[in-house]
Amino acid sequence: MAERADLVFHNKVIDGAAMKRLISRLIDHFGMAYTSHILDQVKTLGFQQATATSISLGIDDLLTIPSKGWLVQDAEQQSLILEKHHHYGNVHAVEKLRQSIEIWYATSEYLRQEMNPNFRMTDPSNPVHLMSFSGARGNASQVHQLVGMRGLMSDPQGQMIDLPIQSNLREGLSLTEYIISCYGARKGVVDTAVRTSDAGYLTRRLVEVVQHIIVRRTDCGTIRSISVSPRNGVPERIFIQTLIGRVLADDIYIGPRCIAARNQDIGIGLVNRFISFRAQPIHIRTPFTCRSTSWICQLCYGRSPTHGDLVELGEAVGIIAGQSIGEPGTQLTLRTFHTGGVFTGGTAEHVRAPFNGKIKFNEDLVHPTRTRHGHPAFLCSIDLYVTIESQDIIHNVNIPPKSLILVQNDQYVESEQVIAEIRAGAATLNFKEKVRKHIYSESEGEMHWSTDVYHAPEYTYGNVHLLPKTSHLWILAVGTCRYSIVSFSLHKDQDQINAHSLSLEERYISDLSVTKDLARHQLFSSDSSSKKRGGTFDYARPDGSISNGHWNLQYPFILHENSDFLAKRRRNKFIIPLQYDQERDKELIPHFGVSIEIPINGILRRNSILAYFDDPRYRRNSSGITKYGAVEVDSILKKEDLIEYRGTKELSPKYQTKVDRFFFIPEEVHVLPGSSLIMVRNNSIIGVDTPLTLNIRSRVGGLVRVERKKKSIELKIFSGDIHFPGETDKISRHSGILIPPGTGKMTSKESKKLKNWIYVQRITPTKKKYFVSVRPVVTYEIADGINLATFFPKDLLQEGDNIQLRVVNYILYGNGKPIRGISHTSIQLVRTCLVLNWHQEEKSSIEDSHASFVEIKTNDLTCNFIRIELGKSPLLYTGKRNSVVSSGLINHNGLDYLNSNPFYSKAKIPSLTKQKGTGGTLLNGNKECQSLKILLSSNYSRIGPFNGLKYNTVTKQSIKADPVTPIRNCLGLLGTVVLKIANFYSSCHLITYNKTLLKKYFLIENLSQTFQGIIFFLIDENRGIYNLDPCSKTVFNPFDLNWRFFHHDYCDETSTLITLGQIFCENVCLFKYGSQKKSGQVIIVHVDYLVIRSAKPYLATPGATVHGHYGETLHEGDTLVTFIYEKSRSGDITQGLPKVEQVLEVRSIDSISTNLEKRVKAWNERISRILGNPWGFLISTELTIAQSRISLVNKIQKVYRSQGVQIHNRHLEIIVRQVTSKVLVSEDGMSNVFLPGELIGLLRAERAGRALDEAISYRAILLGITRASLNTQSFISEASFQETARVLAKAALRGRIDWLKGLKENVVLGGIIPVGTGFKKLVHHSRQHKNIHLEIKNKNLFEGKMRDILFHHREFLSSCIPNNFQ
């Protein structure tokens, strides 16, 4: 060694990496023993210097960064702008969350970067600054939380909390910040113990799987290998780590020169030569390529990680591998509490301007683009030099490629302004996961959307829809009666209602009738009559089912056969009575009745079905097939014409036959799960009450047909005779024909005449043999349908009225289609339908009719009706926008409203009779009736229809003097059908029920108010009708912040931009004097003002899931939409350790992109189908296992590397090899060797397949470490792991033998473990061992013959069929 005076003094700080290099060089030069003495001296020196320095830490040493104040203020300003955009509907909730996280993360990271320069400038010897580079708990992230800001926190599920902690631990936390800090940090002894025990349990399971893996041979002789190439995008560091310590499987050539030979171990020098020469792909030996799964050889394992030479014989490499994977998990568990749950995801890094100045860069090197948030930016494809010039300073910044420039050239920038965004590294961006986020409604209202939506495939009949493109979802403001079910009020559509006058009360209606107390309830009284007039009415939604404890009906309206028709009111309308007996509950709903079908919106198209009748004569309780013979059928109802019900659709097509007869061939059908054990054979003949499965017996006797499908088994029993035809029998040539009576039947040599129809079907169990099944047939004659016309009076159909009713019979099932009956239900074969039609007048364009259900109630008598009204709805409509429509005061020829119209109270009528109200005439398209709408200052109300009204003009001055809002020159307003059946002056009033909500209702106490139940329609300039919500049950309070009025004066040019029903966002400029302060929908367009209905927009992206129907009323907190988005996984080890466990246990996780189980199934199916047996099973299993092994290793390594933990691949490969070493015997090919569902080793399955004549069907399976621990060769090892009693009982029943080859079973029994020094005993040669060797040689001779047979397939396989070593 050189003299001390000759040594060079290196004044350099030695960190962890430098210390590693020093120790490595010392070992190379001086060896292990001398190096240990040197390291002892280094340790002593370190402790002496630390004692002499005596660094202490005080609270005054925590210096806050000066730039923190304006950084936090800038982030808050950005968050405020983001919140405004979200409120305007420009940014959806997920984007808002993501941008908010990125804003605060960038702020926190910039503070952390500013921390070290600040310390170096102000106090370089600060103890906190010195500790920030010591590692472990003393790192920059810890110090940043002390003097910077804690930033964003992760909750226990790994989700980011979007509210950041702006304070640091030096300043102290507020109450909210403290709660979030506790929520995110999740410190505590209990949690620490749980996490540590999880890592310990993982280690135990890993050791259980591989404890028997020992290095037993020097070379197994394999010629398999795994290819590693530096060219396929693998980072150089990972490439070096993969190669060092391995053994080459093939020679490496560069040109004609061999630079490395087979079975040579790879050192760092050889790896550097590979990298410098860029050699061809390198084939190495790994534990995957070793021939046996119960041990491993020296060359397949490679170098020992302890001393750098080839691993010694007898080394327990399995236990080393298990602990190498599990122990970092124990360490990393504690890292959670070092950083306190702070989010450290990968987001973009910002570049800020150092001072005020003008920025310059080469515009030719950038091209315009947008950021991921949609903001304009420039993208640079190569390195870009940006210059910032001030008066006396010039600053140059180098922007790396693929970064975004957020400012323009020659733009003036301020100090600390963000000028560029450097994209995050690929490693952090790749580590993502898919997350679902539910968005909830912030207010009560009706849901609308502005684009077409699709039904989600898994929710075809539900209310879940998918958005095909970006659009807005709107919640239109509405005040609903949450508990109201049936409203016993006087209000009609567009009547005004005062919501405060409603007292809500819950009651239970015991049956479908109204209670007598309600019938006697007097809702109002009129002064014009001495008799009290009682009545209630409401509007129906005939779209659901009634439930009253006794009945559940899909079609709630039943027509009795003894019903009497009342009367026909007008030409284009007729009324059908619905009567029922209130006393007899059991006879309330007849068993067979006529059902009325009316859509949700109440609109019946031409030739639509009004009612139908299910004849019990055409009802069957068994499955079967319908046949029409040779008669053609016409499908008269397409799919789009079917009647829809809420949540369900009647999808069975209806067929109208042209004959009077059809046939039903009965059969017994059982649909069983795919795993069911069937006790009968296909094409066998059984008797009645024969057991089919363990718990199912046949109801009839006959021929059994078994059809296996993907996930189920269909078992059919054909009753009838079996006929074995002769060569000349003509019947046997046909398959599936109907034979009429009177035809000869060949049963024997004699011919018998048939008395009934029969169905002949040809059965071919094999190619040569066949027989004929003769099955009985049930014949149905289609009689004329029930004459529904008898329910109506004669004058209805004989008066030459527009309306026509037609009776049509439908067969509900197609010709030859199988009919499957659900248990305990009957099958209806024929349905008799009443089809609605009407005469088409020359000038009329009536294409639909409106139907509704009404109930007239007088005294204690109640009558139900169906009202059908033809023609366009007399909706409220006016002409052009700028035309002047007569507007004036009401003077109905001195009519006293107070006495004649009971709809208005005394408080409201004087304002009309004193001629102070204002109204506008609103004409419908046909000008057959007029409707007058009046807006008062206190509420809304509507009068009409009236004929012959006279109007006087008024001036604007009188309007200003009176607090009545005018509707002069109204373009249109939201209105509904004018109910012609309502007689304002009669003693009875109408009521219909909301049939889906019969459990509760509310009662009106203050009867002097008028009320409004809104059912909306929109009319545009082209007279198009938009049905916004045909079945809503909503209540408006016009002055409860749901309506907004503003007066403005805009010119005619800009007025064309505003259309009725238009929905716009907040801050949109509607006219020249300013922007709209609140989002909403235009419901009235007037020359002087608009009426806006408040609305809340929600932006939704393509693929989002919308919950609910269009127009459905949502309450606050209801789920509105669900987003699916990708987010960066936070760099918290609590996300890593459970994921390692899930991968090793082979559980499917959403965040793993490729599901290995699906990949296994796909490989099995494709290759088995291409190659056939036995090669299909062999090759598909080999390729599947090889691919799955590599994928599993990569996924586990990805988790550990993301945490900075380096584990050699060979440890993972030993574990994964055991997880994938078993195959599952399938049920496709029944063999006499293995049972279906049995787990056997892959090598054993290949060996048995070669030795036997028949192929063994098996498929690859990924066990997981727990199942692999319970499926080993040693039952003692399994029993000591878990489920001891079950494992020992099964082993005793099977007579299993434990050969005590592993470590654990020898430890349990107190024997010498076969590793280390105990390994020599196993390799000691004796006579017995020689005999065994001879037997193995004989066996190998036999296998050599098999390999000669399979020789020509070697080129197809990546490796040849291996010999078996025991």
Swiss-Prot record:
Cofactor: Zn(2+)
Domain of life of the native organism: Eukaryota
EC top class, as a word: transferase
Manner of cofactor binding, per the entry note: Binds 1 Zn(2+) ion per subunit.
The keyword Metal-binding is assigned to this record: yes
Binding-site residues for Zn(2+), renumbered to this chain: C220, C290, C297, C300
Keywords: Chloroplast, DNA-directed RNA polymerase, Metal-binding, Nucleotidyltransferase, Plastid, Transcription, Transferase, Zinc
UniProt subcellular location: Plastid, Chloroplast
Chief subcellular location: plastid
InterPro entries: DNA-dir_RpoC2_beta_pp, RNA_pol_beta''_euk, RNA_pol_Rpb1_3_sf, RNA_pol_Rpb1_4, RNA_pol_Rpb1_5, Rpb1_funnel_sf
Molecular-function annotations in GO: DNA binding; DNA-directed RNA polymerase activity; zinc ion binding
GO biological process: DNA-templated transcription
This protein's GO CC annotations: chloroplast; DNA-directed RNA polymerase complex; mitochondrion
EC nos: 2.7.7.6
Catalytic activity: RNA(n) + a ribonucleoside 5'-triphosphate = RNA(n+1) + diphosphate
Plastid is among the record's keywords: yes
Coiled-coil boundaries: none
Protein family per UniProt: Belongs to the RNA polymerase beta' chain family. RpoC2 subfamily.
Free-text function comment from the UniProt entry: DNA-dependent RNA polymerase catalyzes the transcription of DNA into RNA using the four ribonucleoside triphosphates as substrates.
HAMAP family, per the entry: RNApol_bact_RpoC2 (MF_01324)
Subunit-level organization: In plastids the minimal PEP RNA polymerase catalytic core is composed of four subunits: alpha, beta, beta', and beta''. When a (nuclear-encoded) sigma factor is associated with the core the holoenzyme is formed, which can initiate transcription.
Protein name: DNA-directed RNA polymerase subunit beta''
Source organism of this protein record: Lemna minor
